Each structure stands twice: as C-alpha cells, then as structure tokens.
Amino acid sequence: MNDLKKSPLLILDFGSQYTQLIARRVREMGVYCEIYPYHINHEQFKKLNPCGVILSGGPSTVTHDANPRAPQWLFESDLPLLGICYGMQTMAVQLGGQVHSSALREFGYAELRLHGHSQLLSNIEDRTAVDGSALLDVWMSHGDKVTELPPGFKVICETRNAPIAGMADESRQMYGLQFHPEVTHTLQGLRILQRFVVDICKAPTEWTPEHIIDEAINKIREQVGTEKVLLGLSGGVDSSVVAALLHRAIGEQLVCVFVDTGLLRLNEAEQVLSMFGRHMGIRIIAVNAEDKFLTALKGVTCPEEKRKIIGRTFIEVFDEEAQKLTDIKWLAQGTIYPDVIESAATSTNDAAVVIKSHHNVGGLPDTLNLKLLEPIRELFKDEVRQVGLELGLPHDMVYRHPFPGPGLGVRILAEVKKEYADILRKADAIFIEELHNAQLYHKISQAFAVFLPVKSVGVMGDGRRYDYVICLRAVETVDFMTAHWSQLPWDFLGKVSNRIINEVEGVSRVTYDISGKPPATIEWE
C-alpha cells in the first residue's frame, strides 16, 4: 500500500491550547497531519512535502514585533494556507495588512455573517438572516483584530465587533479565520475544516484504522525481523493496544511483563492476565510486587513524592525482570502523539507551570540497552481506541475510563497502606458497577472513588461507628483540559452510597465532589 504519510497536512503551532484539537479534527476526516513549531526549518518543511498548512492560534499579540511570526518563505510556497485566530493575524501583518488591539474583545459565542462567495465558506450556514445572508454560530477568543486587509485579500465574513472576521485570497488559496473552527462550539467547524483540508488542499483520506494497522504491522516486521520484543503491560488502553498490535505482527516474539503494584483496581490483575495470557496466548511474566511498593511508600504523604517513588519502584521491578531475559533486543512502549508533541516542546509558551507531574509511569531504564519500539507514537488517544477495536479488543477495555499510572496511590489522600487500598478498591468497584448497571458509565468521561484520611461518626444498627470517608468523583469533558462535574441522579448516588457503607467495612460516610476543572484538577492528587 502507499505510504499514508507521503503528503501530510502540516499544522504550525503558535502555542494555542487548541492546536492538538485542530490535528484531531483533521485526523477525523481520514487525513494524516503533523504538528510542528511555527519556526520550522525550510529544508525539513520541503522534505515533508505537505499538501497544505494550517497556522494555529496562540496567546501572543502580533502587535509586538518580537512575537512569533510564520516563516516568510511559507507565503511563497504556493501551498493552500489557513490561518486561525493568531494565525490569521500574523498572515495579515506579514502580507502587508494591519492588526490592532481592540477595546471590543470577543470571548465566547458570536454570530458570524458571511460575505458573498468564498470557496472556504460557501453553502455552509446555521441559518439565514432576513436579508438572506448566511449566519454561523462560532467561538471567538481574541483581543486583537485585523483592521486592514493585505493586498489581494477580500472579506469573507464579519461579526458585530470584528468587521474582518475572515479573509481570503482565492487566487493564492490563502485564508484567515478569526474564530476557532476546531472547537465543538463552532457548530459547522468540522465542515469548514473539511472544506479546506479535503476540497482545497486535496488531501488524501486514507488515514483509517485498517490502513493504520496494516502500515504499523509492516513497519514492525521490517524493524524487528526475528528479534524479540519486551513490553511493560499495564492493562491501560495504550499498552493493551500495543500488545495486541505487536502480537498480530510478530506473535511469539513478544514478551510482556505485568507488574502488580498492589495499587490496581479490583480484580484488575486477573482480568489482564486472563485477556492477554489465556485468551490471546501472549507470553506474560506476572510479578506481584505489592509488598515492595507498600514498603517504599511507608510514611510518605506528599503526592509528588508518592508519584516519584511509585515510578522509581516500577522501574526497579521492571529492570529486575528484564535482566533475566537475555534474548530480548527491543523495548516497546505505548507512547502516543500528545506525548511526542509535549516532549518536542512545540508549544511557544515556555513559561508554562507544571501543575503536577504526568501520571503515566515513564522513564524505563536506560541500562537495558534495548532498541526502542513505539508503534502508536503517531496516534491520538481516540485513534488508539479505534485501532484497539479494529484489533478485536473488547469495547469495555478500549473505552475504560482513564486510570493514573500511580494507581490508587494518588487516590489515597494519606500514607498508602494496604488497609486503605483494600477499602478504596471495593468502594471504587461498587461505584463503577452501578454506573454500568444504570447505563451511565459511557455517558461520563471519568469516574472514581477517593479515600479521605479522616474518620466520621456513623450509626449501624444500635451501634456507633467511627470510620473512614469515601468521596465519589465523576466528570464530563471533551479534552480533559477543562471538565464539568457530572450531575448524576440523586437516587443513583443514594444507592451507591448505601451499598458502599453497607458492603465496605471501614466506611461510615460517602460524599460527592462537585468541583469543576478549573479550579480543581480531575484527580485529587
């Protein structure tokens, strides 16, 4: 088959929080795209041979000369270009237009009125005005605005506060949009992006799960040959899909190590070993390291320190098992595209603050001296799930809610003890079971229980109890960057609370977390 990446769409990143969302929308069309920093090298650009370019938004202002600009040679490349928000503004300035800061800023919904005909927006509308003009509901987020068009451009849409909300030079296939078509709040946003990517750029639409799997298998076989591959299997979506993909590609050459940290969900170890070992026939080395992890965590209450200890201990256990396998040449990892983007530091916001270290246990040991294999490093999480389904993994496994790498260690808001982990495991399992029973599980994005290190008075029968408190957390989100707490039915929450208090020894009270993100994070630690 043809190389799926031979003529990608490129997204040049100016630091927008929505840059990855643009890429996900493009991938949804079946088009392969990649994200690069706005200052991409010209030689690298030519080697990529893109079919078109999108300039992302960003937090800077083009009214300051020192702020980011697109490479000037880009505007002489004869490729279709689409600038979004900051991308439109830098396009305007660099091609001879003008941008000024505005006292009338636009943040949130705006009604967009289309001007005449443009290839980008023609026949796309939410409704029509009395005079017959097409109207769109769009999402704005800007303080600056284009006040004078570059030579050769025309206005293609406007809002009340932005007379130039979109511009086009049809002869050179250059377009600018002040609003954000990539967010779901812009109802016709996907159609607009599709018009640019598929119709104007003529991008091939072959980026499908079937083709992705075929190409990945061919690449794995070509890289690995007859050598053996080691994979740390956690039971999470990423490592599970890597295991299934590698097993299909190289069969018995794959060896997995599964580490039971003692901080997993109820029956999780048994489920992973059953699915991948007994049912799929993958060779799995199972290590029960509960005592080692609990000993290492003894007396530690700081969340960041707990993360570091869990990560370090995991590496030690994995390294110990790997050293026993003398014929392994490759180490496979479930690195996905957002990890690659973040590690490549494509964002222009160098002053970003680390809220908490990344949950996923990473940094497997360099001492293994193995070649690295990352078969899903070009996929977003939603694409990983689609590939997993195509490989035959169960829907419930592929669409299981996210679980942090440190496991229950960051859901016990105290020193991690076996007693606390056992209580939390049972309470969490009841919550998840009832969400499934009520057909609510797949309507929310993430749900879990948290163990609180406080005791509360309760009454059971004629006796007085002084036991621990469990807090339930459920959120709804599109991208996990922001989240709303889920408004679960009161009778449902009452049923879950009743079951936990009656069935989990050591719990006298259940609460529900009604904090959004921001200001709270989704996980408590």
Curated annotation (Swiss-Prot):
GMPS ATP-PPase domain: residues covered: 207-400
Please provide the record's keywords in A-Z order.
ATP-binding, Glutamine amidotransferase, GMP biosynthesis, Ligase, Nucleotide-binding, Purine biosynthesis
Pfam annotation, one family: GATase
Q: Please give the name of this protein.
A: GMP synthase [glutamine-hydrolyzing]
Record-listed E.C. numbers:
6.3.5.2
Known partners and oligomeric status: Homodimer.
Q: Which GO terms describe its molecular function?
A: ATP binding; GMP synthase activity
Residue ranges constituting the Glutamine amidotransferase type-1 domain according to the UniProt record: 8-206
Q: Which residues form the active site?
A: 85 (nucleophile), 180, 182
Q: What is the lineage of its organism?
A: Bacteria, Pseudomonadati, Pseudomonadota, Gammaproteobacteria, Legionellales
Q: From the record, give the cysteines joined by S-S bonds.
A: none
